[in-house]
Amino acid sequence: AKAATWVAHAKAYADAYALPTKELGRGVPEQMLMMNVGRPEGAFESQFAGYPAIVYSYEYVDVYVVNGMIEGWNQKKSIKENLAETAIASYAKAYELDPKSESKVAAGVLNLANALAIQADALNNMGKVAEAAAAFELAFRAQQVVPAIKADPNNLYNAGMLTTMHAATLQGEEALAAFNKGEKIFAD
């Protein structure tokens, strides 16, 4: 297959990854949520970072609104498993086949890395530390696909720190495995 085919494949997977949350952003007014995403399937009261929140429930995501502003979200399900990982691998294959495709690959991996970092931040704000760490690590890995892109070390630092924080909540072999993973991330 040609590099362009791999870029198209990667873009489809990256777009599918971002789709459930692409209209969301912290600090966006509740009214914009309703205009951009539509009416939720339901709503209920909850807490977000210690504050009272209204949670608007959609098929793929719960959106947390505090004082009329989106503060976070929890993606309940994905369109398909491993979308981001598949997109990263496809972009890498495209670049491997044709290094001249660098500008298209770079644009795609940067968009994906940004979506992953935003999702990681949302997960961290929800207290989902392990999932946030994984998303930050994927954001960093996406940025490494094209050598011309300077991968953001903050993503790797966040991944390592959150992995270590998660490990501190575990016991026995699980804790050891998580600490080792955090150490490996920091070694990169």
Residue spans for each PLM region:
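Short coil/linker segments at helix-helix boundaries
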Residues: 12-130, 138, 143-153, 166-178, ...
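Conserved alpha-helical positions within TPR/SEL1-like repeat arrays
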Residues: 157-161
